[in-house]
Amino acid sequence: MVIIRKAQPSDLDCLVRIFNLNIPKYFHKKELVDFKKYFNSNNIETYFIIESEGKISGASGYAYENKQTANLCWVFIDPNHHSNGLGTKLVNYCLDTLKRDNQLNVIQLETSNLTFKFYERFDFKIEYIKKEYWPNNDDLYFM
């Protein structure tokens, strides 16, 4: 059974373990500090955990840039659960939640050349690309 729930401070250790499993393919080790800062800020209110078979399998959230713009943030899944639809469920959950906000006009995200095609499935469009932007020299895709 799959459930999605709000993140709790006690989830951090498990999320760090899953984050580390995504290094170096999807994240650089330097990004872990940024993720921890994000998680330990007030953004935890809009950060969600996906559990599969009673175990945390990934997370995703969003942060408001202003009343009209939100950013999808820190989407990652345990590599052992990639291609099982968990990332899709989690992103859809965040997008459905955001779409209920009548003041919101824009949902955007920053991703890489490795994952932008995943977000195109949700109708995100590439606005611009910055070459070798991320610490591991992957390109930034702003969508």
Q: PLM features: what roles do these ranges have?
A:
Residues K89-V106:
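Conserved acyl-CoA
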